[in-house]
Amino acid sequence: GSITLNPSFFKDHLKLNINAKGSINKNTFANTSAIWAASTMNPTIPVYSGLDTFGGYTEAIDNTGAPVNGAVMNPVGLLNMNDSQSTVKRFIGNIDADYRLHFFPDLKLHATLGYDYAQGKGSVYVPAEAAQNYTTSGLDYSYGPQKKENRLLTLYANYNKLVESIKSSFDVTAGYDYQYWKSTTPLYSEMNTLGEIQKTSKASDERHVLLSYYGRLNYSFNSRYM
């Protein structure tokens, strides 16, 4: 959902523009190996084997009954026996404020405040009998929450004046910008259906700050020369 407000105060000397948006996205990720498998698998081979092994899907097996290493796997099995999902929550908001001084209307003050926050977490489940993770007894783990944060502050003053007596106009701006980014991911382990760790991903914490100061002067004479 989203909301937008545009109030003004003090006889339009102060104008605000307020925006806020929130969202929840639920994602399902397919095993993309199914694309290659579908394009290369022998189309005359039946999808289902009629057996309980490998979830009932036909797979190339060796003399031990295990999937053949490097063989093309059943694309339908790759899709249906892989449950990978995530949920991402996000909020974006900003406020713009413009203020013209009552006693000095040629001077405008502006401020922008912005905030962007996202948090995501997910889970992966592949049953132990699936051919795609047969040697590791499947997968069963969760990860997250991964967090991203962005803050913005912009402040500037603008003076705009036309002096007809000397056929001149002045446009002066001075400002300041602050931006902050933060991205964090907690430590998590990929585990099989037996609770055994298969792989561990390290935690990460990245932060960046950007500061800017700026100024500008535009002068024009007789509406021709700048």
Predicted regions mapped to residue ranges:
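Surface-exposed loop/interface segments of Gram-negative outer-membrane beta-barrel transport/assembly proteins
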Residues: N6-I92, H110-Y213, S220
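Residue-level recognition of beta-strand termini and adjacent short loop/turns
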Residues: F10, H102-F104, N222
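A conserved hydrophobic secondary-structure block that centers on an alpha-helix together
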Residues: G1-L5, R100-L107
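Short, intrinsically disordered, charge-balanced linker/junction segments flanking boundaries
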Residues: G215, N222-M226
